């Protein structure tokens, strides 16, 4: 009996160490950033069982077999659609400003399509204004409405949008709504999904959370885009979820969420529509390519039109493109660079690009919320402040609520707005969208918004920062070490 017990014990110990060795080897063989690999190895060797389970659940990018097959299957038809779109030469920009040219060329080479011109663009900073404009557009819709959001929180004006969407569906408008399962959990546990489906709206719960499949698909891979397309002519995107700030996370202690959205008219709606169609096919298996270019796209030739490029990320989309776009934008800056983000946990490359810009004389400012709804990210962000301040970067802490806007402005001419946070999750994991806009007029509008944010912020004093308590420094370094995993 003792011999059997001893044998089982030795086999268990051997299996335990073989499991650790196997996972270690898998981490080392995967092409990933060194800080990320080191952080995973530390967790696994300090808390082996917890670390191994965590790594198998969220350590690698698993879209899931069914979705991965759909992603592969959709590309031939998507590529053909893009080639057909290229025949509409009048919608594509032939040249860009000197500051935007490198980024637009990068996007064209990697996505197979140039930036589109002739778009009308309106920047919106008040949630009420966004929802009122959206309700008007829904009421005037003639053919189709597509929406995707990370969060749809019932209550307030979000319910008015839902009512207008159901009214549109009842009068024959084809309405599709895709919401992230985790972000919109309150919505899916409310009466709204059934009400909408009964009205004729196609409602899809994207990347459904299923603990039984935790090792088959990465559960923290989320659908983080916020997009609306109406009649393949009007489009919205930005940082705002479908929530009324007066009813959203009021007990979080961070104040109301401050967002930014862009309302657009023109060919950009078609460029965003193909992104939506890819997401829809990956999730449902149904192909809904936008109408052919000769039916959908009007010959916009206004001199006042904006040139815009869409940058999409996520499984099935060009790998690392949003990260490359941010690096390109930072290195293109000659006069000033202003970045706004709620979550700042950058890659080493992006941090280096930001600091290098400041060190070569560019006026660099980063605007972050003083209070954050994520304690982990809040502490991890602080770990980067010393290096930023030493390089000459101005760090502003916004005090008027949770600043949720994601924006970048380069030399007043190249603007980036969308859903991308400056953290690892947005850069390399989630389904995201960013608009790159090459236009001085829009740059001036964005600069005015950012100036307003700065006026409601406190500039971090480098001397006072260096005098912060020791316990804060220890906490920052601890969270910094695990920042590649956040």
Swiss-Prot record:
Q: Which of UniProt's keywords are assigned here?
A: Cell inner membrane, Cell membrane, Lipid biosynthesis, Lipid metabolism, Membrane, Phospholipid biosynthesis, Phospholipid metabolism, Repeat, Transferase, Transmembrane, Transmembrane helix
- Give the top-rank taxon of the lineage listed in the UniProt record for this protein: Bacteria
PROSITE patterns recorded: PLD
Protein's recorded name: Cardiolipin synthase A
- Provide the function of this protein: Catalyzes the reversible phosphatidyl group transfer from one phosphatidylglycerol molecule to another to form cardiolipin (CL) (diphosphatidylglycerol) and glycerol.
Could you give a single Gene Ontology term from the biological process aspect?
cardiolipin biosynthetic process
What family is this? Belongs to the phospholipase D family. Cardiolipin synthase subfamily. ClsA sub-subfamily.
PLD phosphodiesterase domain mapped to chain residues:
219-246, 399-426
Highest classification ranks of the organism: Bacteria, Pseudomonadati, Pseudomonadota, Gammaproteobacteria, Enterobacterales
The active site lies at 224, 226, 231, 404, 406, 411
């Amino acid at each position: 009996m003792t011999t059997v017990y001893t044998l089982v014990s030795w086999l268990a110990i051997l299996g335990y160490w073989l499991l650790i060795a196997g996972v270690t080897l898998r981490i080392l063989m995967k092409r990933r950033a060194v800080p990320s690999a080191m952080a995973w190895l530390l967790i696994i060797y300090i808390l082996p069982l917890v670390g191994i389970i965590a790594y198998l659940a969220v350590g690698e990018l698993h879209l899931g077999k069914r979705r991965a097959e759909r992603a592969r299957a959709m590309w031939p038809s998507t590529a053909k659609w893009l080639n057909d779109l290229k025949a509409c030469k009048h919608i594509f920009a032939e040249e860009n400003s000197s500051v935007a040219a490198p980024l637009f060329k990068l996007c064209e080479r990697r996505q197979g399509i140039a930036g589109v011109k002739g778009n009308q663009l309106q920047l919106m900073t008040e949630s009420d204004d966004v929802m009122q404009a959206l309700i008007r557009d829904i009421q005037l819709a003639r053919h189709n409405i597509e929406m995707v959001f990370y969060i749809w929180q019932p209550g307030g004006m979000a319910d008015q949008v839902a009512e207008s969407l159901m009214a549109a569906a009842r009068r024959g408008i084809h309405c599709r709504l895709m919401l992230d399962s985790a972000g919109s959990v309150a919505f899916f546990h409310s009466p709204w999904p059934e009400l909408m489906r009964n009205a004729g709206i196609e409602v899809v719960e994207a990347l459904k959370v299923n603990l039984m499949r935790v090792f088959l698909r990465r559960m923290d891979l989320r659908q983080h885009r916020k997009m609306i397309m109406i009649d393949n002519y009007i489009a919205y995107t930005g940082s705002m979820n479908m929530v009324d700030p007066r009813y959203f996370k009021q007990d979080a202690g961070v104040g109301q969420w401050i967002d930014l959205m862009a309302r657009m008219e023109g060919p950009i709606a078609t460029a965003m529509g193909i992104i939506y169609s890819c997401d829809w096919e990956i999730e449902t298996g149904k192909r809904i390519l936008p109408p052919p270019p000769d039916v959908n796209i009007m010959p916009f030739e206004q001199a006042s039109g904006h040139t815009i490029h869409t940058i999409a990320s996520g499984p099935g989309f060009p790998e690392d493109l949003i990260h490359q776009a941010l690096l390109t934008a930072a290195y293109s800056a000659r006069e000033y660079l202003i970045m706004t983000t709620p979550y700042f946990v950058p890659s080493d490359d992006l941090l280096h690009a930001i600091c290098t810009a400041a060190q070569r004389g560019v006026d660099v400012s980063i605007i972050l919320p003083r209070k954050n709804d994520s304690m982990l990210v809040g502490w991890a962000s602080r770990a980067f402040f010393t290096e930023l301040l030493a390089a000459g970067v101005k760090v502003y802490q916004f005090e008027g609520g949770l600043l949720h806007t994601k924006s970048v402005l380069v030399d007043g001419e190249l603007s980036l707005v969308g859903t991308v946070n400056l953290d690892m999750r947005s850069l390399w994991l989630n389904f995201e969208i960013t608009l790159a806009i090459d236009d001085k007029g829009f740059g001036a509008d964005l600069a005015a918004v950012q100036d307003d944010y700065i006026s409601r912020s406190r500039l971090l004093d480098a001397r006072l920062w260096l005098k912060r308590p020791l316990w804060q420094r220890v906490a920052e370094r601890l969270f910094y070490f695990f920042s590649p995993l956040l």
